[in-house]
């Protein structure tokens, strides 16, 4: 795919996303397929040549979509569907187009400084002192692990990392 095709199909993708979210309520929350239904429809050998985007999109709609649990469905009550507001989806287009590596200031100064400013805004919004420090976890799982490790360290008077649970 070249950038001209990207533009054409990107617009179609945005239209697809709009239609999907507008009609999501009409879909079943969970897939109605049985285990192996999707797997058995996928060829055993990879294609020898690149497939046309039309075929890939058709496969997506006919093969993949029936096997999807719709996490953003209004009747899906598991976990936390908090990452797919229209603004988040649009932001993903920008970030995925650039594909920046934002792990250090040197690799992406703007991303680092934007993150710092947003954290300052969180502090203001939550009434925290500006000197307050913390970490925003990426999932409930890592947040729970972090909380458990923090509780362990507090209970062991900050010696758990060096001595372990049994002072060994």
Sequence positions of predicted segments:
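N-terminal entrance/gating region of PLP-dependent enzymes' catalytic architecture
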Residues: 1-131
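Conserved beta-loop-alpha segment that forms the PLP phosphate-binding cup at the N-terminus of a helix
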Residues: 115, 119, 133-160
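Short, intrinsically disordered, charge-balanced linker/junction segments flanking boundaries
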Residues: 159-168
